[in-house]
Curated annotation (Swiss-Prot):
Binds 2 [4Fe-4S] clusters per subunit. One cluster is coordinated with 3 cysteines and an exchangeable S-adenosyl-L-methionine. Keywords: 4Fe-4S, Iron, Iron-sulfur, Metal-binding, Mitochondrion, S-adenosyl-L-methionine, Transferase, Transit peptide. GO terms for molecular function: 4 iron, 4 sulfur cluster binding; lipoate synthase activity; metal ion binding. Pathway: Protein modification; protein lipoylation via endogenous pathway; protein N(6)-(lipoyl)lysine from octanoyl-[acyl-carrier-protein]: step 2/2. Belongs to the radical SAM superfamily. Lipoyl synthase family. [4Fe-4S] cluster 1 binds at C132, C137, C143, S378. This is Lipoyl synthase, mitochondrial. Residues 146-367 form the Radical SAM core domain. Residues 33-47 have a biased composition (Low complexity). Residues 22-32 have a biased composition (Polar residues). The keyword Membrane does not apply. It catalyses: [[Fe-S] cluster scaffold protein carrying a second [4Fe-4S](2+) cluster] + N(6)-octanoyl-L-lysyl-[protein] + 2 oxidized [2Fe-2S]-[ferredoxin] + 2 S-adenosyl-L-methionine + 4 H(+) = [[Fe-S] cluster scaffold protein] + N(6)-[(R)-dihydrolipoyl]-L-lysyl-[protein] + 4 Fe(3+) + 2 hydrogen sulfide + 2 5'-deoxyadenosine + 2 L-methionine + 2 reduced [2Fe-2S]-[ferredoxin]. It comes from Aspergillus oryzae (strain ATCC 42149 / RIB 40).
Amino acid sequence: MAASTNRLRFLYSSARTVPQTGSITPISRRTYATTEPSPSATGAPATARKRTNFTDKLNAGPSFADFVSGGEDNAPLEPSEAYALKTAMVGPAGRKKEMTRLPSWLKTPIPDSKNYQRLKKDLRGLNLHTVCEEARCPNISDCWGGSDKSAATATIMLMGDTCTRGCRFCSVKTNRRPPPLDPHEPENTAEAISRWSLGYVVLTSVDRDDLADGGARHFAETVIKIKQKKPSMLVECLTGDYLGDLEMVKLVARSGLDVYAHNVETVEALTPFVRDRRATFQQSLRVLEAAKQARPDLITKTSLMLGFGETEEQLWDALRQLRSVGVDVVTFGQYMRPTKRHMPVHEYVTPDQFELWRQRALDMGFLYCASGPLVRSSYKAGEAFIENVLKKRRAAGTAGESVTDSKAAVDEATR
């Protein structure tokens, strides 16, 4: 033990007496293994980084200030250039085919706002469906993305999410025997709408040809529940044709709603190729006419999609027939193919053409017309113009039947 202690003392004293022979060479910071001096220590210039083609292009191009200020390169395009459709070759080598790109005026933002998530949570919590989701509507980010729920619009889809028909343009699920109706749906729908503090709501439904009444009584009961919870609520109903049963059409029309909507979807000549074989253009006209006869004060509404290959004369003929049965409101929108299994788009109609047809419809005497590439039947249905018309009619005492009268009419039809 004493020997070890003496040895440690010797080593310690030897280390203290080591002579300093010169300055210590600085070690490079790049690695612990090298003993070469760093450029900063020797004063030698650093080696310049090799330039690349990408860097040269960036340096030679416009600056951020040029981009913001604009210039000749950023001048507005002529309509012919702005509306020109672009194509691309897609597919594996040897089997590429030309595809038309979606026009810029049809592109919309991805829905991701907080309000979108809140609305979706409310709907799922009450087991409700919306046509916004089921039909893959491109406007969902706009309609659901308001800063608060009162600014948002959602079209509730009644009677489930499965339709008994198979139209070639629609992405809603189809089945000959969908699940039975939810008896709590009318109450849940009224509850959800009362939570949102909306002033205008749109109800629609899938076609239920498996039911004796097509779901008309279920539809009418939902309207009555909404009016009971909030009599001032303006309700628009977008219904099916009930296989031509006009008594069911009149039943829904007398339920207390404010706007009766039924879509003809396309011109008469293309109806057999676009819609399910059980739906016809003339049958849709009879539905709209029956609704107006049941309630002459009722606003009736329909919608057409453009881009199926319709001609101008066919559109003129469709508008003339719609006016002949007293339709008040018409909308035009661009057909957009949901999946490859659906009918292809024949033409992308430009915004200028949509504006032209809006003016033509108003000149023919339609009360209101919404026309644009992204317009859908229930898109911004509660426009200020329609709301003002309805409120004026209500103030004048021509708003139709009361909730009590509507319930009595439904009860009578049920017996």
